[in-house]
Amino acid sequence: MPERDSEPFSNPLAPDGHDVDDPHSFHQSKLTNEDFRKLLMTPRAAPTSAPPSKSRHHEMPREYNEDEDPAARRRKKKSYYAKLRQQEIERERELAEKYRDRAKERRDGVNKDYEETELISTTANYRAVGPTAEADKSAAEKRRQLIQESKFLGGDMEHTHLVKGLDFALLQKVRAEIASKEKEEEELMEKPQKETKKDEDPENKIEFKTRLGRNVYRMLFKSKAYERNELFLPGRMAYVVDLDDEYADTDIPTTLIRSKADCPTMEAQTTLTTNDIVISKLTQILSYLRQGTRNKKLKKKDKGKLEEKKPPEADMNIFEDIGDYVPSTTKTPRDKERERYRERERDRERDRDRDRERERERDRERERERDREREEEKKRHSYFEKPKVDDEPMDVDKGPGSTKELIKSINEKFAGSAGWEGTESLKKPEDKKQLGDFFGMSNSYAECYPATMDDMAVDSDEEVDYSKMDQGNKKGPLGRWDFDTQEEYSEYMNNKEALPKAAFQYGIKMSEGRKTRRFKETNDKAELDRQWKKISAIIEKRKKMEADGVEVKRPKY
């Protein structure tokens, strides 16, 4: 066996007298135990592709070397790494003794480095009684300085990133800490001396016979003015509530603490109230002096007359259609939807009222234009020119009810000219009282005034119904949940009728063409023209009969 693994080695030679080339003799020879041992000692031939095999471990070399034994080398390596691990554990133990887990201390609440800062930050602004201005200012300044130093210096003296002896800020901080410690030590030394010098309470030296006397003494000599808490000044603290929020009923209100400069002091409020009272009294006295005896008391009769002459004041309220505000603590979403629906309806009503007012203004303007045109037309007519009924249309906006007014006015104009007969076919029986003596006057000048019927024409007071017009609201149509029950919603959907706005501006386009709003007015106008033709024919007939000497019956009122 080779001494080293890297040295090449060969198989041992065959025994003497053994012919390997002759297979027959090999099979015929008898093998003994010695041959079997030699066969076992012969190593196996390594394949060409495999690396050379190592020597057998159980075969001992001629001279044993501990460095060449793999087991010995492994034992040495294990012991070496065990020593390194032990040294590392000892070093970590030494570091752990010097190391402080600050995160764990903060979690446990035992961090000693920031006790002073935490004490100031937690108790400076939460006192039962408000401190004085100087104490408040000094505490706030000290707290602000500690915060800035902690941010700038990166912690306390032991763990700061600044270099000792080179940073001026660190030097100032160390000096301030030394000065504060010396001051605290001096106060602690002086405190026992002051306690010893403190006298006893004078109340203990005085003997009181009654409890009333003791209470009087305490009220006179030991009463102290209570210090006010600055947070409870008038107007200092207020509640902030978001009214636009849908869940404002259940939300917790936010408290707002105003600055002391924004809050008025008690002295200023008292002075202001006193000045207001004095000024109001002086104003009242001066008004009495200016009026003198004019403002004397009236007698009962004069007082009654004065009250009768005084017109009643109109109660003008610009918000009369809105209603009173009734706050409620619990509102369901259904109530909120109902209120929104009512608000939308009120907005629509206001829009409709404005549109109606604009339409009335336009109608008045058109009426003025018609009056001016009639005046000009009247000036152009000749004095004895007869009216052309068929050629000149009349602008009458009134419906069929305007005929009664027209006949009544004609009766007043032509009273006494002729009798009343044959007009029953034109009028209803109940209209006879209104017509009166249609031809009462014989000296009628109706034919001399061709523009009389134009003067009698009046416009209709009927307004266009804009309730069905689509106002163009952006809030959209009403849905099922805007109504309380299904019946109300069904009734609304059955009666809903909305026309586009263009239908009221340009009319509705039908099969025979576009018909505007004047369509109904032209029909009334044609009906009025037909009735006027019949009345004119009756007037002519009565005139001829009266000219021929035929007696004509006159109606009685």
Curated annotation (Swiss-Prot):
Subunit and interaction comment: (Microbial infection) Identified in a complex with SMU1 and influenza A virus RNA polymerase subunits PB1 and PB2. Directly interacts with SMU1 and with influenza A virus RNA polymerase subunits PB1 and PB2.
Residue segments, region 17 X 2 AA tandem repeats of R-[ED]: 342-375
Protein name stated in the entry: Protein Red
GO molecular function, one term: identical protein binding
Post-translational modification N6-acetyllysine, affected residues: 98, 137
Annotated organism of origin: Homo sapiens
Role noted for this protein: Involved in pre-mRNA splicing as a component of the spliceosome. Auxiliary spliceosomal protein that regulates selection of alternative splice sites in a small set of target pre-mRNA species. Required for normal mitotic cell cycle progression. Recruits MAD1L1 and MAD2L1 to kinetochores, and is required to trigger the spindle assembly checkpoint. Required for normal accumulation of SMU1.
Gene for this chain: IK
Biased composition (Basic residues): 294-303
